[in-house]
């Protein structure tokens, strides 16, 4: 079991078009939101859908793949690790972010033509 200390596996649907940027040193980074939905019972015992949203981060060549092939609605399987960071807003408020830095990705609805 390699690297299970900080390991995340998700299957879900892309919730928005990926955002692709370039860092100051020229490295590409892509982010997107992935929705995972599971069935749960509410207080009355009725089965309902519960959706969680996850922010995914892709670096380098993976960011290129995301930019060219991933669109809203695409079904993906990913494996990665959790990353926590914080920043301070212009108004001085501290914000915390949890993201999944993706190591591996698979297209589950088949790969599409380049955008």
Protein language model features and the residues they cover:
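Single-stranded nucleic acid-binding surfaces, predominantly the OB-fold ssDNA-binding core
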Residues: 1-115
